[in-house]
């Protein structure tokens, strides 16, 4: 079977796409809170160590897996793992590479729609009115709980449907004409908006005090294991590692594309957005403008409280506050847009490459699945559905898949001889293929041994500290009640019911994988032709 796949039209296109998948709410909201509550400037030390020993190596691994998968006509982990092991069970192990984006898609589009709504409210001046009336908390809660109406319909539902339609429309154009083009436009706009906000923040009187709160090192925190775990977790989260996204995007590379430099460039872009933009905008200005508040109080607001309540309040106190609010939510919207399409693309790629669906059929199928999951998130928001989905899709499974990938790269792919470079193993031959600057040999032990061990220690440490409590729900009070669809039930019962739903989704996914291989649509012998596209047509 000869299969023609889409591809990136330029190197800058794939770099911006991968960077766009990583740059999101985690950069502008999660990172500042993590840094401020884990030693301030001292947090950067374990963060950079984790970036060098964990983030960059695992990113190179995922780019390599993606290149290998694309050579055999696959764009996701089931196909990649199957080609590496040549064993039937490997494709089911690869389902772990589809579960994170699937689970995240169940809630991410809804959250993305909040940003679109608040961008609209900023432009119209409604948000400034709410801030001046000191009712931002009530306004936000009413909105997400579907109490804010446009006519008879909750505003949150309307903006969700608009956002869902926009994402679907962009994805319908494919990798080159859809994802690549939107990232070429959105990423520069996002960075420009971020730089404008940074410049404005740095001109605020006494901002040095806010920066001191953020960056004044508390080196005593470096002896706390939780700080190192938090730093590693932040690197994992912010670089989109273990999500199957980088693997999928790398599968659309042209032959001889430089993945060593491309990976570093994408990682550096994400780091700039996180450390320079995220670390400068949020906490420093919040400390200055929210008189009497300290880091701990601000951090307790959480990601959503900080982004949708604290920051509108803070910007509302500045001259031209509505413009600042619009820039803030506009920046977050472009970050959310580039992340959203990257989350859904691996699912579409699986349908196209392994189930042999057409692009429209693949998008329709995934849209139905994600819409059903989104409805559960919307209706179960107050009951904790989003938190539960984020734990599995945005935290736990990322580390599990990342650890598995690291061991496969180091102890399976790196043990296989390259057909094209007999003196080299398959892992590093593919990683260095087409690279202008080859990976230094002294860095190989870090990739082969330090990174897998680092990940294993991270996973075991988490299990030893609070992992079992989270998995078994022992920290949830038996008498804690939540409401879902108008019915009151215990939080434990709701959470286990949601987990049963996720297990059923996992089973159905593996049934789809079995169907793909049984019907010969994902067989190992097929050849792939990558469409060559001139740069001028991008």
Please annotate each region the language model reported.
Residues 2-6, 34-38, 68, 73-96, ...:
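Inter-helical loop and helix-membrane interface segments of multi-pass membrane transporters/permeases
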Residues 6, 35-65, 155, 398, ...:
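Extracellular loop-to-transmembrane helix junctions
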Residues 1-29, 58-63, 67-95, 254-258, ...:
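Membrane-interface "cap" regions at the ends of multi-pass membrane proteins
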Residues 25-34, 41, 167-178, 199-211, ...:
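Transmembrane helix-loop junctions in multi-pass membrane proteins
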Residues 2-12, 180, 184-337, 341, ...:
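Membrane-embedded translocation segments of transport machinery
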